[in-house]
Each structure stands twice: as C-alpha cells, then as structure tokens.
Amino acid sequence: MAKINTQHSYPGMHGLSVRTTDEDIERIENGFIRTHSLCEDTSSELQRVISMEGRHLSGSQTSPFTGRGAMARLSRFVVSLRSWATRHLHHEDQRPDSFLERIRGPELVEVSSRQSNIRSFLGIREQPGGVNGPWPLARFNVNFSNNTNEDKKEEKKEVKEEKKEEKKEEKKEEKKDDKKDDKKDDKKDDKKKEEQKKEVFVIDPSSNMYYNWLTIIAAPVFYNWCMLICRACFDELQIDHIKLWLFLDYCSDIIYVFDMFVRFRTGFLEQGLLVKDEKKLRDHYTQTVQFKLDVLSLLPTDLAYLKLGLNYPELRFNRLLRIARLFEFFDRTETRTNYPNMFRIGNLVLYILIIIHWNACIYFAISKVIGFGTDSWVYPNVSIPEYGRLSRKYIYSLYWSTLTLTTIGETPPPVKDEEYLFVVIDFLVGVLIFATIVGNVGSMISNMNASRAEFQAKVDSIKQYMHFRKVTKDLEARVIKWFDYLWTNKKTVDEKEVLKNLPDKLKAEIAINVHLDTLKKVRIFQDCEAGLLIELVLKLKPTVFSPGDYICKKGDIGREMYIIKEGKLAVVADDGITQFVVLSDGSYFGEISILNIKGSKSGNRRTANIRSIGYSDLFCLSKDDLMEALTEYPEAKKALEEKGRQILMKDNLIDEEAAKAGADPKDLEEKIDRLETALDTLQTRFARLLAEYSSSQQKVKQRLARVETRVKKYGSGSLSVGEPEPEKPEEQKKD
C-alpha cells in the first residue's frame, strides 16, 4: 500500500510530499490489485492526483494550490474527488432497443478520469464514441474558452459518428426485417403451393365430360346384364365364342377399374362450391354404399376358371352390381334430350325387354335341370333337330316368357311343384311390373297429347261462340286459319305460363337472349342504359296478325309501338290497296306516339295505315309499360324525349312555338288527375286521424268525469300524489 507523508503547513511554502512507486500507480489505475477498502481507495486517489501535480511543480517551493493556475488545480482536485465518489455506483445494462435510443438521445459513455473530471466541471456532456486521449493540464487555465470550442467540435464529430452508426444499425435491422418478410412470403408461397397441390383434377358431375364417361361405362354394364345370364344358361353360346367373351369380359373389367378412379375424382357441391380437395373427395366416395358395391363388382372371381374351367360365366355375376351407373346414364340423358317423353317410353320398353330376356333364360335353365322333354311344361327334347338349334332354344324361351309375364294367351300348364312355384312367381312379377310400366306409358302418352288437347279445347270453345253469335262464314274461316297457323308454327305456347316457375334473373336472361337484339334496332333505344333495356325486354309481348289485318289506322291514338320479328307489313293509302312502303323483319313503328313529346303536330295519333300482307309476328310494347319502366330512369326518359324531338324536327313534324309555350293540355289533365287521386288519399287519411282524435277526446273526458266524481266524494285530499284511495264503508261495499 502506498504511504502518504504530508506536511500540514498549508498555505506555507512546503508542498505535499507523496512517496509511491510507479508500479503502485499503474496497479491502482488499471485495477489489477486486491479488493481495497474505502479508505485505501481514497488514499490512492488522492496520492495519484497530488503526485501528478507535484511533478508539474517539481523544483518549486510554492504550494500546489497557490500561484499561477491555482484555481484550475483546485478545481481538478475537487472533480477527482467527485469522480471517485461516483465510481462505485452500479450502472444498469441498457436495453438494446433502437426505438428507446432514438427517443432519449445519445448515451453517456465513461471516459478517462481526467476528461470526465474536467467535463463535469465545465458542465459538458460527452457523447459515446468520444476521444479518450490524455488531457494536458497546461491548457486548463482561467481562460479556457478555446478548450470548450474544441470540446464542442469533438462532440459534433462524435454525434455525426453516432448518427452514422445508428443509420448502419437501422439498415441492418431493415435487412433483417426484409429477410423475415421474405421468409414469411416464402412460407405463404409454400402454403399456397401445398394448397394447389391438394387441388387435384376434378370432374364436374354436370359437365359434358362426365356425361360422356357415363355413356362409356353404361356400355359394359348393359353388356353384362344382357349376356352373362344368357351365356350361363345356353352352353352352346358360351363354348362356341369363348375367345370373344373373354376379350369383352376383360375389356369391361378395365373400364370398371377406370370408373372407380373417375368416382374418386368426381366432385360434389359443398356450400354451393365444387369441392376439389383430394381427401374430401376420397372420403365422400368411400363412405357411400356404392363404393362397397363397386369393390365387390371387381373381386377377381374369374380366378375360379383355373380350377373349374371357362364354361362357368356365372362366376362373373358380381359385375352386375354396377347397375347404378346404367340408371344414372338414363337419368342424365332424360334431362338433356329434347324429346323426354319419347325417351321415357323407349326406356320403359328396354326395361320390359330385359325382364323378359332374364325370365326366358331362367326358364331354359330350369328346363335343363328338370330335363328337356320330360313333361309338357319344360323345353322340348333337344335331340330333335328342330329344337336343337341355339336360335330356336332362345326364341322358344323368349316366347314362353312373354306369354307368361303379359298373361296373354295360353301356355302349357306346369306339372311338377318347382314348375308351379316358378309360374306363380312369374305371374306376381308380371302383374306388379307390367302394371307399373303400362301405367307410366299411359301417363306419358297423355302428357304428350296434353298441349294438343288443350289447344283443341280452345278452338272448340271459339267455334261454339261464333256459332252462337252467328258470325259470318268468312270471319269464322279467318279465325280457324289463324288457329291453324299458330298450331303448325308452334306459336301456341304462352311464354309467361312457361317461364313463371323460373327466377326473375333467369327470366331476364332468356328475354335478353331472345329479344334484346330486336329491341336495339329501334333508334330511340340504341343508346339507352342496359337496365332500362332489360326492363323493356321483359315487357315485350308477342302478337300474331293474319293476312289483311290492320295493325293501326291513320288517326288512331297510339298506345303501342311494334317491332316486326317475322313477316311483311305494308303502309297503304286510305283505300287499303295502294301500297307506299313495305316493312320487313327488324322494322319498327309507333315509337314517337308513346313518348308524349310536346309540340308534336300529330300529337299521339297515328299518321299512316299499316296492314299485314301475310301472317306476321310482331313484338308489342305498350305506352303504360314504357312509362312504368321510365319511372325508375328519369334521365333516360329525358334522353328518349330529346331523341324523339330531334326525329320530329328532321321530319318537320314539331311545332317549336307550342313546345316552348308550356305544358300540353293533356299533360295538365294527367297532372290534375294525379293530384285528385293524391287529394283523395289525403282526405281518407285525414278522416282516419280525425276519428282517432275524437275517440281520444272522449276518453279524456271520461277520465276527467271520473276524477271529478272522486273529488266530490272524498275531497281534494284524495288527489295527492301517491296517497291511496280511502276505503269505502262496508255498507257501500255491500251495495
């Protein structure tokens, strides 16, 4: 430990003498000594400062705290004591938070003892990254303005360096964040890729592709249902064409296998969307009964051929379990065909033939088991050449099956018990199945003739009416011809009746598909809004005119406009014979008269006679329907009126003075009518309110009367709020 010898002669001529070695000073400054006590730290610190001052004043007899620079030395001594006092304070490690660093500014960094002492004395905060070099004591005199300027410059440099470092750190953090974002994006992309991988190829059950596959799979199913029973019962058929049957059998098996893959990829709707997840598709199919039947239909029962031989096609009867595919094909075809009634009849006939075919094969098999020709019921003896042929065997069995199931004609009676049992079952099956089939056929035929019967009923009622009213023969003939034209050209369909079960959206789409192109041909509707055109399309009504019919006559009030769909119309003179112009498909007329354009010289009246040359199909749009549609489109109404006004001005058919004069008297009349209707509604509402008011007044009067009676009986005290009514005497209660 350093020893301190001081002479207490301050402020005398003798200075403080310190005896210590250089090694001790280095150990004290660098901290490579044992743990000191508080007194030892104080002594070593004082010795270090005083020795440094003693070196500068060596050879001088004056006191270190007197003379030139005394104040600076004294201040350094005081600062060294303060720095020593704060040396052992515990400094917390700061959080590596860039946000907090930006908020609270640059940090304070520990520097060498001399620099910290001097700067604390001057009140200067040093930023981190400062220069930790030695501070010459000679610079510190009374006038230390130069030192402060240099400190400020150094501080500015340090601040700049810190800002650069902060920017570098921020860039590094941004790079890290970008890398994290890139990793997140990569993860999202990987998830999307995984989802895309999950979405496998799916067949929409309502698509043409699925229907085409049903057509393919229906062929082997129908083959198995027709040929397996026939080959099992007629041995000659199986033996003579064994190679053909093997080829067809295994081709059908291959199609069966592919059909299972198709079922695994057949989508289904979940919440209105087609499911494309492989696992869901697989679970949806495997949980159905049809999956079990499909698996059973593919069991390799053909392996028994290796032991029993190839003459046992009944081993393949499990292939018949795919019958659901055949029914599904028939259902899809029925919804797609344009002739559903004809298809239903053909489908029922096919079912009848299959039932008769199976019954015939079973009859021949029973005859073979009992013995050919053993009695009159079984098939005759095959040893007879006439009955030994394969074609005769099948046709005879088919004939017997048809007679038995339809109960038409007589068949040989059964002899043995098993024969009786088989005939009884045949009769029951025939009665049940054929009663159902014949009933369905009858209803289908009646449905096919329903439209004709309904139309004929209308014609008959018109004939009876004309006969009752004694209509002329010429007019009656024209009416009958008009009905014949409607029937032959299939124009008897009431579109509203047919489309009434469809939603409004589909009705609009059908109407747009049928009538929109025709409506766009009209000049005033060419630039209209799409919504208005759709409204008008739904209001178009088809009409048919006979030869010689007048569509409109000159001077008639125009309440409709017409668009020619098919046929020819002629603009004729007053005599009805002279033709001025012939109008054909796509032409239109009467569009100006339904707009009520102010100043029109013709008003709303027709300006020409138009007559049908032959049968003509026209679309009619009434004025009321147009105005009803235009109520929701006021701007479109103004545009239509402006277009109509321009057309009239081109043809010099508008009176500009009348248009500028004001409203048309007819328009005023219409407004007056509307005001009258509004006034009527207001009067009814006022009468209702008046009745309610009078009833409420009566109730108030009744309540006031009751209050007055109570006041008279019990006095004013009974009217106090919250006070109960006085009890009535017992005599009054009895009364």
Curated annotation (Swiss-Prot):
InterPro entries: CLZ_dom, CNG_cation_channel, cNMP-bd_CS, cNMP-bd_dom, cNMP-bd_dom_sf, Ion_trans_dom, RmlC-like_jellyroll. GO terms for cellular component: intracellular cyclic nucleotide activated cation channel complex; plasma membrane. Residues 149-191, 725-735 have a biased composition (Basic and acidic residues). GO terms for molecular function: cAMP binding; cGMP binding; intracellularly cAMP-activated cation channel activity; intracellularly cGMP-activated cation channel activity; protein-containing complex binding. Pfam families: CLZ, cNMP_binding, Ion_trans. Residues 237-246, 312-316, 367-389 are extracellular. Keywords: cAMP, cAMP-binding, Ion channel, Ion transport, Ligand-gated ion channel, Membrane, Nucleotide-binding, Sensory transduction, Transmembrane, Transmembrane helix, Transport, Vision. It is a multi-pass membrane protein. Residues 142-191, 715-735 are annotated as: Disordered. The chain crosses the membrane at residues 215-236, 247-267, 293-311, 317-335, 343-366, 390-424, 425-449. CDD domains: CAP_ED. GO terms for biological process: monoatomic cation transmembrane transport; visual perception. Visual signal transduction is mediated by a G-protein coupled cascade using cGMP as second messenger. This protein can be activated by cyclic GMP which leads to an opening of the cation channel and thereby causing a depolarization of cone photoreceptors. Belongs to the cyclic nucleotide-gated cation channel (TC 1.A.1.5) family. This is Cyclic nucleotide-gated channel cone photoreceptor subunit alpha.
